[in-house]
Amino acid sequence: MAVKLQEVVDKLGMKPLSAFSRLSGECSGGYVSDLLSDVMANAKAGDLWVTLQTHQNIVAVASLKEIAGIIIIGGREPEKTTLAKADEENIPILLTNLPAFEVVGRLYQMGISGGR
């Protein structure tokens, strides 16, 4: 089921930090991992990626995999270089204070699942 990123932001109380014009876009699934190599091997185009990573390499991986957006959990603030790269690559970064387990549960309740 495809869900608009803005709906995710609104329902989970997230703070968008980059690529604001892409919030009207949709995600078609989700993936949670903190290992970049795992995301490169297993995430699908259109996924929302849930991670605690904040460095700019997450943007490179998201761009490579055509990820719909990155959710950074636990209130961790991304580096300024990460946000600049995300804007350049047009990758939405969403910030939440929630832990990964709760974020994934709420996304699932919205109809977003992994393993398509």
Give the predicted meaning of each segment.
Residues 1-20:
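N-terminal, charge-rich interaction modules
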Residues 24-25, 33-48, 52-116:
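Feature captures the catalytic cores and cofactor-binding loops of soluble hydro-lyases/lyases
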Residues 29:
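Conserved phosphate/pyrophosphate-binding and hydrolysis machinery centered on Walker-type P-loop NTPases
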